[in-house]
Amino acid sequence: MSHPLRSLPKIDKILQESRFADHSKELLTTLARDYLEEIRAQFLQDATPIPPSESILQEVERRYEASLAPSLVPLVNATGIIVHTNLGRSVFAPELIEEIKPLLTSYNNLEYDLKAGRRGERYSHLHGILKAILGCEEVLVVNNNAAAVFLILHTFAQNQEAIISRGELIEIGGSFRIPEVMKNAGAILKEVGTTNKTHRRDYEEAITPQSALLMKVHKSNYDIVGFTQEVDLQELIELSQKHNLIDYYDLGSGFLESVPFTNEPTLKKIASLSPSLVSFSGDKLLGGAQAGIIFGKKSLIDRLKKNQLLRMLRVDKFTLAALEATLRAHLLHDYEKIPTLKMAHLSLEELEERAKKLKSRVHGYESQILQTQGYAGGGALPNQSFFSIALALCHPQKSPMELEQSLRARGVIARIEQERVLLDMRTIFTSQLESLAQILNEVF
């Protein structure tokens, strides 16, 4: 009697199947080999029956199609979290994409000086507009704020002391820890104060001839309340000037215009204090592309540009184009091109109107329009919530978790509160309401 494993089709026979005539032979070979190996392993482990040849061919074809499908897909963000890190943070307006499309579909002057006819500098493209908006001496853009932190520490505090409050030794998403970053950058961490209280004298008493930098980190994803004390940026700047040190503020998020649900200072206000160096993210409340934007003293940023690490951390043409377009929209107060800010400023009346439109198009659910709370997200504005409007849904047969899973499978990311699935209107675009209603009716 023939061994069951002998019934498995050979790789070359699979490749010769007419259904695979237009398929990539390299990819098909890899997928078929992997699947056949799985079948062998399962059979040898617990004698799992060998599937018929046709079933094997169908599964190989399914895997082939799945492997070619984009892994990044558009979603409906119904969570109410505006800058949702897991969902790609800030969204670009279609008008902005159209604006930068010619730069991405043709050659451009990324590193070419059109006036001089020779090699230029890619960082010059954001130089003028950022200086105009912030009123600072100089700017530099790297590929994210973590890169900015590392570059600054590596340039100015390698084998020297970077003094920081114990209450600001944060960890953010992905296990990004400030102490580890400082260590990897070659800086000597010198923590001062306590978790809840740090005074100016704590910094001053810690300063030695080996000190290079006074660092302040924005507590982006948590807050300390109650019996607390911290040294503000103005004091840190004064102290650094007194002792001829560099003050550096890792702002994390940062925003140019006033956001309705926070009393934190804007980037313009921070820049007006003339700090040595500040860094923040381009894709959080600024509403642009992922980038780490550094501004401050020209002499210091010139030194950053000479660090060989900058070559590894530099931004590409898409980032520069998207950031420039976003900053231009800020400069012209054209917030239609900055969805992040537009969402933040939506009134409850506008949100309720969206909820009513969606509710009228959905059938069979027990639904209710209610006021809820949302957050900025992206590690910005910790513990600062704002009012929003949501459509709360209950399904007659499915549990809230089952309904949430069904929606998620169709690209709708919602949240569950009090045994109901909530669709927060603040982060759902009006252009998505029709398709969202269709999905909800299909799920029902």
Curated annotation (Swiss-Prot):
| Catalysed reactions, as listed in the record | L-seryl-tRNA(Sec) + selenophosphate + H(+) = L-selenocysteinyl-tRNA(Sec) + phosphate
Extract the InterPro entries matched here.
PyrdxlP-dep_Trfase, PyrdxlP-dep_Trfase_major, SelA-like, SelA_trans
Annotated GO biological processes are: conversion of seryl-tRNAsec to selenocys-tRNAsec; selenocysteine incorporation
Instruction: Return the GO cellular component terms, semicolon-separated.
Output: cytoplasm
Q: Which UniProt keywords apply?
A: Cytoplasm, Protein biosynthesis, Pyridoxal phosphate, Selenium, Transferase
Q: In which pathway does it act?
A: Aminoacyl-tRNA biosynthesis; selenocysteinyl-tRNA(Sec) biosynthesis; selenocysteinyl-tRNA(Sec) from L-seryl-tRNA(Sec) (bacterial route): step 1/1
What this protein needs as a cofactor is: pyridoxal 5'-phosphate
> What's its top-level EC category?
transferase
Q: Which GO terms describe its molecular function?
A: L-seryl-tRNA(Sec) selenium transferase activity
Q: Where in the cell is it found?
A: Cytoplasm
**EC identifiers of the protein:** 2.9.1.1
Residues with the N6-(pyridoxal phosphate)lysine modification: K284
Q: Mind telling me which Pfam families this protein's record contains? A: SelA
The family assignment reads: Belongs to the SelA family.
Free-text function comment from the UniProt entry: Converts seryl-tRNA(Sec) to selenocysteinyl-tRNA(Sec) required for selenoprotein biosynthesis.
NCBIfam families tied to this protein: selA
State the name under which the record lists this protein: L-seryl-tRNA(Sec) selenium transferase
This chain's source organism reads: Wolinella succinogenes (strain ATCC 29543 / DSM 1740 / CCUG 13145 / JCM 31913 / LMG 7466 / NCTC 11488 / FDC 602W) (Vibrio succinogenes)
| Taxonomic placement | Bacteria, Pseudomonadati, Campylobacterota, Epsilonproteobacteria, Campylobacterales
Q: Quick one: which gene encodes this?
A: selA
